[in-house]
């Protein structure tokens, strides 16, 4: 009995050490999303540049698209912005979600840095971000023609991320036949 009591702390230590050691090989930027394979959450939000124009989840259907969560307060969003602009110029459909931001600042940002978005919506109170499980900005979702979330990137979408992760999936979604 005394021996078991003495070995218990050692056993607990070994179990904790194994989990900590295993964690050294995990990618901290890889944050799984429970929404992969599920429809984009329902929303009805105004456009940043024209609040009378609204976008809903139904508007995301028809073509594969990127949905990019961004904010003027986000330094990493500024880093990825030129790549998003390049992709939009190549015909990639990109929607923006301006997350917890001031609308006037967002309009100024888009006017100064160019607007890569087919439409960017204002999620000023963060409700859609909460439904998406947003950890912060930038985050980018790849959705298919039916509005199903197929992939999520947490962090900057740069040329490497586009080339290695998103472009192959995007092309695959473009090549899929229409659902009947």
Swiss-Prot record:
Periplasmic side: 26-180
Membrane topology of the entry: Single-pass membrane protein
GO cellular component: outer membrane-bounded periplasmic space; plasma membrane
Pfam family, one: Redoxin
Localization per record: Cell inner membrane
Gene3D superfamilies: Glutaredoxin
Disulfide bridge partners, by residue number: 74-77
Transmembrane segments: 5-25
Ranges for domain Thioredoxin: 34-175
Biological process annotations from GO: cytochrome complex assembly
Cytoplasmic side, ranges: 1-4
Record's keyword terms, sorted: Cell inner membrane, Cell membrane, Cytochrome c-type biogenesis, Disulfide bond, Membrane, Redox-active center, Transmembrane, Transmembrane helix
GO molecular function: disulfide oxidoreductase activity
Keyword Repeat: no
InterPro entries according to UniProt: Periplasmic_diS_OxRdtase_DsbE, Redoxin, Thioredoxin-like_sf, Thioredoxin_CS, Thioredoxin_domain, Thioredoxin_ResA/DsbE_sf
Primary location group: membrane
Family: Belongs to the thioredoxin family. DsbE subfamily.
Role of this protein: Involved in disulfide bond formation. Catalyzes a late, reductive step in the assembly of periplasmic c-type cytochromes, probably the reduction of disulfide bonds of the apocytochrome c to allow covalent linkage with the heme. Possible subunit of a heme lyase.
The protein, known as: Thiol:disulfide interchange protein DsbE
Organism this protein belongs to: Pseudomonas aeruginosa (strain ATCC 15692 / DSM 22644 / CIP 104116 / JCM 14847 / LMG 12228 / 1C / PRS 101 / PAO1)
Phylogenetic placement of the source organism: Bacteria, Pseudomonadati, Pseudomonadota, Gammaproteobacteria, Pseudomonadales
């Amino acid at each position: 009995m005394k021996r078991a009591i003495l070995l218990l702390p050692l056993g607990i230590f070994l179990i904790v050490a194994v989990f900590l050691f295993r964690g050294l090989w995990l990618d901290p930027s890889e944050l799984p999303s429970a929404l992969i394979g599920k429809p984009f959450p329902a929303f009805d939000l105004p456009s940043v540049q024209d609040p009378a124009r609204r976008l809903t989840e139904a508007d995301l259907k028809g073509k594969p698209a990127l949905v990019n969560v961004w904010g003027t307060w986000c330094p990493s969003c500024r880093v990825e912005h030129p790549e998003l602009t390049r992709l939009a110029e190549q015909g990639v459909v990109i929607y923006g979600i301006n997350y917890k931001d001031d609308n006037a600042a967002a309009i100024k940002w888009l006017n100064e840095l160019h607007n890569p978005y087919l439409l960017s919506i204002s999620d000023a109170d963060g409700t859609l971000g909460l439904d998406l499980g947003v950890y912060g900005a930038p985050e980018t979702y790849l959705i298919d023609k039916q509005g199903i979330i197929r992939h999520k990137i947490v962090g900057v979408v740069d040329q490497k991320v586009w080339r290695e992760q998103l472009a192959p999936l995007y092309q695959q979604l473009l090549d899929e036949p229409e659902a009947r």
